[in-house]
Amino acid sequence: MNQDGIDVSYLKNAIATVRNATKPYEKNSTLPRSLNSLHLQHLLELSSRVVFHQIELENTVTIIRNNVAQWLWQVVLTGDKIIECLEAFRNYFLFGQGDFAISLVDQFEKLKTSRPKGLTIKDQELNSLLVRASIGTLAENDSSFEKFRFRVQNVNDKQFVTRTNMFDNITINVPLRFEYDIEWPLDLFVTTEDLAKYGDIFSFLFSLRRTQIRLQKVWTHLTITEKASSNNNNNNNNNKLNDNGSPRLILWKVLSSMMFFIDCLWGHVQMDIIETNFRKLVHRINISSAQHQQFRKLKIPEHKKISYANETNLVETEPFRDFEDIRIGHSTYLSDLLHGCLLESRVCSDAIKKSLNICDQICGLLERLNSNMVDKNISESVTKLEKEFREQVTFLFRTLSGLNKKGEGFGGPPRHLDQLLLRLDYSKYFSVWS
């Protein structure tokens, strides 16, 4: 379909969506008669031409599309409402609310220890957990938070396991989806597919943040046991912490390398990917909203407004013309997030998931240590898991390095891989491993 066909299709769908809406916008549910007359006049003039010119048709369709966009922006939605929705997604889908993220992880850890194995978990239980996690955080008084919910996914659902949703069951071994109840008119630019992508990113970020917090707690636990053991005079113990090459020293090294990797990955997805792309999207919506506000203040004919819009050049960022542009821009933003989180690469996602599982196993072993004594079996298990972790991280580093050079699977060498590799290898740490 050419651009004219796309524009005409947009006009039809946009107007039909408003007319069929269940919300009380009846008095504004149809285009003004003056606007209809203006559009009809343009079309009649075009049809009366002796010679057909494609450029005239394109100009006419552009005028009509921009006029309809102005009308939609006024009676349906404003840029502020869109940004409020995006900020809610940023806070909860993308873990922008740090206090809530920590509380949510804690609630899930409590659920794992208190829930009998084999007991079926229900949506109501998870949503009660969600409410408890919000207590004492900024989410508690956030009205947008009420629209979020958990859902236990049916194993018979289509496309149950894909490259992007493989992190759904890493938390409590039950496939969970974090969802949002989208309402009209926000569904003009947020589709069901978009919400599914947000759910995929949430599962990945939750798994990453949970592992990060757990490693930090284990580090604190080892520090406490070290201080406790330093008060004892067990200098004859071959396994004490201060012996060079001792099992306890190996534990610190393993934890340090794991925390470094997880911290690099978390910092990359939050700062280099999510925050950067979020700011760009919000900026485009802001300048688009400002432009629409400016049009409303100017008391000039509609066709003149279109000419003004075409002559307005914003050097920094191109504004969105209408909701279809916003929808496309938002979909592009989500695609950039998925690529930046490496979720579009099954190989990379699989390596990250295996690395997180290994970190979990290490934490499970070390959480049981209550003294400076390191059992031989624990020492051997940690050594084995550390080797597996090293293999996965080395494989991931080599894969990313190869993708960065060749651009395979990403449509060209993406800049975000440069940023991630720089974080990981700024001191040649992973180059030595590789």
Label every PLM stretch briefly:
Residues 1-434:
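Long alpha-helical rod scaffolds of large eukaryotic non-enzymatic complex subunits
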